[in-house]
């Protein structure tokens, strides 16, 4: 299946010519932590971070999540991705993937307009070649 999901979308946005193969899926979701990952992170770091309880950890986690989100949004905006599109990608419940159509991706400037399709056999060997989603 041809797809670019989750963190791959950040790599796509970093490109100069952002093209996707016909029929490829581009999937976005909001950041999240699974409960088991949170528990492990807390147990592994509570002493070095001086978290006296899970509420201290929660305070740190909230702050860290907001800082990480700000960095992500700043990067995507610097790459020219439309703000409303980014907000839409954050409105989905955790672990749900959003698959916008090609027109939406182009209008949001996540894929380069007028260069949205990659031929099946790659002929462009330039350093600005697109991400191949296989």
Locate predicted features.
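Glycine-rich beta-to-alpha active-site loop
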Residues: 1-40
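Charged, glycine-interspersed solvent-exposed loop segments at helix/strand-loop junctions
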Residues: 36-131
């Amino acid at each position: 299946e041809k797809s670019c999901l989750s963190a791959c979308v950040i790599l796509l946005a970093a490109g100069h010519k952002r093209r996707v193969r016909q029929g490829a899926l581009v999937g976005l979701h909001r950041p999240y932590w699974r409960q088991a990952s949170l528990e492990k992170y807390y147990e592994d770091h509570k002493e070095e971070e001086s978290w006296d309880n899970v509420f201290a950890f929660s305070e740190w986690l909230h702050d860290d999540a907001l800082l990480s989100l700000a960095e992500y949004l700043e990067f995507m905006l610097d790459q020219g991705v439309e703000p409303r599109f980014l907000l839409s990608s954050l409105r989905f419940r955790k672990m749900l993937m959003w698959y916008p159509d090609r027109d939406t991706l182009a209008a949001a400037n996540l894929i380069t307009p007028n260069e949205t399709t990659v031929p099946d056999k790659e002929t462009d060997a330039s350093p600005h070649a697109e991400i191949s989603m296989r």
